[in-house]
Each structure stands twice: as structure tokens, then as C-alpha cells.
Amino acid sequence: MKIPKEGDFITIQSYKHDGNLHRTWRDTMVLKTNENSIIGVNDHTLVTESDDRRWVTREPAIVYFHKKFWFNIIAMIREEGVSYYCNLASPFVLDNEALKYIDYDLDVKVFKDGEKKLLDVEEYERHRRKMHYPKEIDHILKENVKILVDWINNEKGPFSKEYVEIWYNRYHQLKK
């Protein structure tokens, strides 16, 4: 797939380590791309689960994917403030079908008051054993949790105060 440009719509697919499709987001609008990252927005986006259940995202969310970091970041924009959901996941790849990554179960939730919570540790451990995650991936993921927490604590990148405002405003300009 050629690198999508600003205003294009793409599909996002998350997989599990065993290669099974986990979840699909249809029609994510691309806000910015470069050789290493993609910033997009989901706003009332159709999501299809692996068991074919479907739902639509409730609020706008700015999404951030990187080719070098083992996480992606979703900034959920709500009336009461911005909260974040961060997936520990492989760096993304693009092909003719979609932006794709492997979801490794561990998640970090950042509440609007700044509180952080590591989620799904038991699910990660269960899948690590069941799907035989290599020790190298286990190590990489744990190191990337540290990098992610550092970004959160230092308001780096998607966690900066200006980031969500800048990209949400850009979304409104593009959708006109």
C-alpha cells in the first residue's frame, strides 16, 4: 500500500500473536503520515470483533501508530476531558488491505486526572504461555511499557497538552 495521505480513509486490523484477526476498524481518517508514524481519527467508526460482533465508537479518538515503538495510543475525547488507552502491540505495517499490528494484550489506561493503570496482565500471561511468545518479545514489551510510562509522565508526543487539540482541529478542517 502506498503511504496514505492526509484526508484518506484506511482500515486498521489488529491480530493476535497466533495470526488470528482480533479486531477491525473501518474508515479511520488519516491526519498525518511520515515514514515512521501515522496519526488518524476515529469518529463513530465501525468496529468488528473476531466473533463478528459489531459496534460503533462513541466519541472521537485520535490514534497514533509508530513503526519503531511497540505500542499504539488512542486519545479519547470526551466532554469531561481526554483519557488515553494504550495498547502494547507490535509496530505497525501497511499493506494493500490495511494498517496492521499484533495486539499483545497489555494495556495502559490514562484517566483524565492523570492516573495510570496497567490492564490485562493476567490475559497477557495466559496468552504468553498459550501462544508461546518468545522471550525477546516479552522483554521488548516490558521495556516499551517503561517507555510509554515515561512519555505519559513527561507529556511527550500524544500526551502533550497541545497534541489532541491540534489534531482534533485538523480533523474538523479536513471533514468540511
From Swiss-Prot:
Any Pfam family: DUF402
InterPro entries the record matches: DUF402, FomD-like_sf, Ntdp-like, SA1684
SUPFAM superfamilies: FomD-like
Molecular function terms, GO-annotated: magnesium ion binding; nucleoside diphosphate phosphatase activity; ribonucleoside triphosphate phosphatase activity
Positions contributing to Mg(2+) 2 binding: 105, 107, 120, 123
Residues the record lists as binding Mg(2+) 1: 87, 103, 107
Reaction it catalyzes: a ribonucleoside 5'-triphosphate + H2O = a ribonucleoside 5'-diphosphate + phosphate + H(+); a ribonucleoside 5'-diphosphate + H2O = a ribonucleoside 5'-phosphate + phosphate + H(+)
Co-factor requirement: Mg(2+)
Keywords (A to Z) from UniProt: Hydrolase, Magnesium, Metal-binding
EC number: 3.6.1.15, 3.6.1.6
Catalytic residues of the enzyme: 23
Coiled-coil region list: none
Entries under Gene3D superfamilies matching the protein: FomD-like (2.40.380.10)
Entry function: Has nucleoside phosphatase activity towards nucleoside triphosphates and nucleoside diphosphates.
Stated family: Belongs to the Ntdp family.
Protein name: Nucleoside triphosphate/diphosphate phosphatase
Origin species: Lactococcus lactis subsp. lactis (strain IL1403) (Streptococcus lactis)
This protein's encoding gene: yjjG
